[in-house]
């Protein structure tokens, strides 16, 4: 796989002059759908990974290898430039370096490393705490050192705006910019004053973990230096509901022929690359793929 090309495409997005919404993806099929629909960037979140791979909530119980394996499955399925949420880097600065190595090998175009104290330690359940700026800087340095392909984008992430306020947020993102991260990712920015403080503080692209309506439309976000703005992870949630409703209908006695919300055959053939597989069968096995229901 030629991962560098999609990383360069991701860089062209964040070095451009407009903000985009990434398509939230969770497996090979969803990634192909996002690519087919024209999303410039895909997003694979840690919370969605935990739900998809383990059926567990976002409590940092997913391992690095489990996350990297699923990221690789997504990357190899198509040509979508994938941004992944690498949480806290699965440990200290040494673990962060290893995390970058594994995710780069998996083919991701960009990743975020955050300065939240994770996983939650004994006696701190119910609250969110941040590591020190000094430890955060160490993690960012380790992430950058672990990168082999210079086109891989590394973003320093913080939730400080929602925890310790604007002043600490600025101190953190300026410190991360100073050591060389390519972008900063912020959660908890809810109004234009907060966004202006952030925008004035750094000269690198800004990613937002969701934008409140008070922040304005894509044009307003673009003008403030935001280049990636998440919209949530509705595709996986919708898939869960659709699966639940379909199974319930079948369990309740609805004949399969009356289930009308399934993907049509031509869509499934397209998304599973059936034509490619038919050609390979002809070229290499001397036969054709039989039609199946």
Residue spans for each PLM region:
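Flexible C-terminal active-site loop/helix
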Residues: 250-293
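Alpha/beta enzyme core
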Residues: 2-248, 282-293
